[in-house]
Amino acid sequence: MISRREQEYKMIGLTIAYYRKLKGISQLQLAELAGISRTHISNIEAPNMPTSISLETLLDIADALDVPLSSLVDFKQ
């Protein structure tokens, strides 16, 4: 059974993938803009591999996507 925390990581990853695709950029382009590896972006976005993410990395990704941090973590609607 997936834990609540794992479910939250999964939702963050899916939200990042959504905004990345909406912006029309690849995982590699996002990784370069955020200053992290493409593999890390891939792991974060993978719904079958909930990956923890540091606040610093999350802020870097939000900046790279030009979205507020809250839009990446506000999935409780």
Please name every model-derived segment.
Residues 35-51:
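Recognition helix of helix-turn-helix/homeodomain-like DNA-binding domains
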